[in-house]
Regions:
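N-terminal small-domain helix-loop-helix segment of the aminotransferase-like
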Residues: 2-94, 99, 376-377
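Short acidic capping loops at alpha-helix termini that bridge into adjacent secondary structure
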Residues: 33, 83-87, 108-111, 156, ...
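PLP-dependent aminotransferase class I/II
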Residues: 68, 225-309
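Conserved PLP-anchoring active-site segment centered on the Schiff-base-forming lysine
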Residues: 103-125
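Active-site pre-lysine segment of PLP-dependent enzymes
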Residues: 127, 143-156, 168-233
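Conserved PLP-binding catalytic core of the aspartate aminotransferase-like
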Residues: 140, 291, 303-336, 352
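PLP-dependent enzyme catalytic core of the Aspartate aminotransferase-like
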Residues: 176, 328, 335-336, 341, ...
Length: 377
């Protein structure tokens, strides 16, 4: 008889918990229409150009993709004005996070450093790899104390993870502060890689031209000890195809291609990525939808008495007026066919995260929230 003898790190692991799907909510509550504002997906859906490309690419699905995804790497290199040798792609940026930890950190000897709370995949993958995670609390206003983060780094630290804009607050640290952190790490701990997760960076600022104010990648001067992570899941609308990419030091990128599982990016995902990079109108419409919706939702939520944290991302973190329960609000919204994200798993049981939707979705959410606040008063 077989005895399942998994490693202790796996046996004690809590699985990543995604938000409820539209199908789950429909089935549970018997609803015909459900609005999902929980997972920070693109409210405009799939690019029209991607739809066309995928419709004509299915006949090639029996073929393996080209090894190393050179066409996609070249396109991303042109987009970000970097050498193709620095570009890596993965089955979502999750794969790149996992690979970086496995390539750089030796179990039982090395550590990774991140904020708490943070994207849960950083500590989860570190734990799976048997690597210590050191966590720095966020400041009371959910900004970053980068000096406190740096204080957790020592000679055995191999990766420092920083998400900007941060999830779930939407906070962006000043670019100068990020540069200073990179220089501190390079000077004192040259074997430590600063991993900057810019999954939501496309939405930063009030207009498209403001990205260089916040982004190390967009600034055009990327420090040598920095890896940038990006994704096609958010502004590009390809969350279901699992496609992410990174800009790494060239030598490290070379090792990534040696260690990565072959063909982890499927051919349809690659074709979709190439297509959406060409669809400038879809990108413009997406960013306009998010930026205008972010302003409208912020205004509407504050008029309802909610605390709303300033956000540079495609979501807002809120706290209900005093006396109202976040969990009850979440359940009420579900019953009305609106999915948002409760933040109890982030250690914030009094807060909620709302993804920016279409104009119609945003107004529907505000109306249902208003009814909850009035009913519960």
């Amino acid at each position: 008889m077989y005895t399942c003898a998994v490693r202790p790190e796996i046996a004690s692991l809590s699985a990543y918990g995604p938000g409820m799907s539209i199908a789950e909510v429909r089935e549970r509550y018997g609803l015909s229409r459900v609005i999902k504002m929980a997972s920070n997906e693109n409210p405009l859906g799939v690019s029209p150009l991607v739809r066309k490309v995928l419709a004509t690419s299915l006949e090639e699905a029996f073929r393996y993709p080209q090894g190393g995804n050179p066409a996609l790497r070249e396109a991303l290199a042109r987009t970000h004005h970097v050498s193709p040798e620095r570009i890596v792609v993965g089955n979502g940026s999750d794969e790149i996070i996992d690979m970086l930890i496995r390539m750089l950190a030796v179990p039982g000897r090395h550590s990774v450093v991140c904020f708490e709370p943070c994207f849960s995949l950083y500590p989860i993958q570190a734990r799976i790899c048997g690597v210590e995670t050191r966590r720095c609390p966020l400041s009371p206003d959910y900004s970053f104390d980068l000096d406190a983060l740096f204080s957790l780094v020592d000679a055995g630290t191999r990766l420092v993870f920083v998400t900007t804009p941060d999830n779930p607050s939407g906070y962006c640290p000043p670019l100068a502060a990020m540069r200073r952190l990179a220089k501190q790490l390079e000077r004192h701990f040259p074997r430590c890689l600063l991993v900057v997760d810019e999954a939501y960076m496309d939405f930063a600022g009030a207009s498209c031209g403001e990205a260089p104010r916040f982004s190390l990648l967009a600034s055009g001067d990327l420090p040598a000890n920095v890896a940038i992570l990006r994704t096609f899941s958010k502004s590009y609308g390809l969350a279901g195809l699992r496609l992410g990419y990174g800009v790494l030091p060239a030598e490290l990128a070379g090792f990534y291609w040696r260690a990565r599982l072959p063909f982890s990016v499927n051919s349809l995902a690659e074709k979709a990525g190439l297509a959406v990079l060409r669809d400038s109108e879809f990108r413009r419409a997406t960013l306009e939808c998010i930026r205008s919706g972010r302003c409208r939702l912020t205004e509407g939520l504050r008029l309802l008495g909610c605390d709303v944290w300033p956000s540079e991302a495609n979501f807002l973190m809120i706290r209900l007026p005093e006396g109202y329960d976040a969990s009850s609000c979440f359940e009420h919204l579900l019953q009305c066919g609106i999915i948002i994200r409760p933040l109890s798993s982030y250690g914030m049981p009094d807060k909620l995260r709302i993804s920016i939707g279409t104009k119609e979705d945003n107004e529907a959410f505000l109306e249902v929230l208003r009814s909850f606040l009035e009913k519960s008063f």
